[in-house]
Amino acid sequence: MSNFEIRVNESYESFKNIDCFENACVVIDNMLRVLENPKNMNIYWKKIVPMIPKAYYDRDPKSDTKEELLYLVCSNSFYLDELFEKAEDEQAINALSKCEQECC
């Protein structure tokens, strides 16, 4: 085995002990908080909010077996970043950055 091959027991070791479900929940918490301001709400977010999986509201990562919450956050990270930047919300920007770096 060469030095560059990844052994099965070593793959994804860097993701060990990272709670991506919780990271995604924090991003959605911030998104919903920012969207409480009517000036931040638009047709795009009106379509996205109903897509938030039940697992988020239950705060139950075991019910999110397909990782739908993380997928929702990661696939919309560009738009979330734009939303948070426009709102000048550092807390939300930092939460998204952490989730992107650790999980997306």
Swiss-Prot record:
The GO annotation for biological process reads: nitrogen fixation
Pfam families, per the entry = CowN
Assigned keywords, A-Z: Nitrogen fixation
Q: Which residues form the signal peptide?
A: none
Query: What HAMAP family does this protein map onto?
Result: CowN
Q: Which family does it belong to?
A: Belongs to the CowN family.
Question: What does this chain do?
Answer: Is required to sustain N(2)-dependent growth in the presence of low levels of carbon monoxide (CO). Probably acts by protecting the N(2) fixation ability of the nitrogenase complex, which is inactivated in the presence of CO.
NCBIfam families per the UniProt record, alphabetical: N2Fix_CO_CowN (NF033689)
Per its record, how is this protein called by name? N(2)-fixation sustaining protein CowN
Organism annotation: Arcobacter nitrofigilis (strain ATCC 33309 / DSM 7299 / CCUG 15893 / LMG 7604 / NCTC 12251 / CI)
Q: What is the lineage of its organism?
A: Bacteria, Pseudomonadati, Campylobacterota, Epsilonproteobacteria, Campylobacterales
